[in-house]
C-alpha cells in the first residue's frame, strides 16, 4: 500500500490527474478494508487505472510512470490460486 500512497503523493502536485487519483484512493481504501481477495482487487484496479489514463489522457512523469509500473507488477505475483 506504500506504493499507492507514494504515487498518490506524486500525483497531487500535478493537475489533470484527478480521475487517476480517485481510482488509486478508492482502491487504497478497498485494500485497507480487505472486503475481497487481494488478487481480485488488484486486477480490477489495473483495469480502472488503464481506463482513467486513457479517458483523461494522463501524462505521467518518469518517476510516476516507474511507480505505476511497480504497482501494476504487484498484481502479477502468484497467490497460489
Swiss-Prot record:
InterPro entries: Bact_Immunity_Domain_sf, LciA_Immunity-like. Pfam families: EntA_Immun (PF08951). One of its GO terms (biological process) is bacteriocin immunity. It comes from the Bacteria. This is Uncharacterized 9.1 kDa protein in BM1 immunity protein 3'region. It comes from Carnobacterium maltaromaticum (Carnobacterium piscicola).
